[in-house]
Amino acid sequence: DAIYIWTDTALFIMRFVGAPFTFSFQQVGTNCGLIGQNAAVEVDGTAYWMSENGFFRYTGKLESLSCLVEDFVYDDINTTPKQHINAGLNNLFGEVMWFYPNSGSGVVNRMVAYNYLDSSVERPVWTTGTLARTAWQDSAVFGKPHATEYNEDGTTATTDTNYVFGNQDGTSTYYEHETGLNQVKEGQTSAITASIESGDFDIGQQGLAGDGEFMMKIRRVLPDFLSQTGDTRITLNLRDFPNQTQASS
């Protein structure tokens, strides 16, 4: 029953109130403006967006999202082409994603995602990656998420009937996500290679004092992979001190 209006520094709510004023405008937050015009998404009545000051959501009250990868994102983001930064919703897995260019790129080449289903105040779930999508539509329209990827170096030959003849200004690939096991791009099919890496673990649970002063011994790993297809390799990166170079198992 409301429309969100962002500036680059604040959030306003517009509501219909009837005659004589028709609409009311209420400022509900400051220092939480939108980093780019496409950097917000709404999920079940909650708005999520990316600001120059971090990640936020509005549930009837303004909330700053605790983000463990915030420095990783904001220390290496190119905010000059703000119009390229865009948000996407993957409601099949409860994820809100933001696609952005890093400091060495003028086009989108990075992604940061927040899982709003699995997150809690004590344990927010964030991931980062190199998935580059310039536009995203969730599964509500096509049944699966659909998105595009832009390649600024892409060109087409004048004899290529799959593209605009003689294009020299980059190419875009149109994807359907969350379907099949392989990537199909430009007529080529290849297996999707996936990986995930966590942050460091230390012993500091169950009220133990001296956080970071205990040595951890790992005897075995019991994975719980559901519907696994193919082989999976688990690598443990070990170090005794925070600034020490990691050694892999």
Regions found by a protein language model. Give the residues of each.
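Beta-sheet repeat architectures centered on beta-propellers
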Residues: 27-46, 52-249
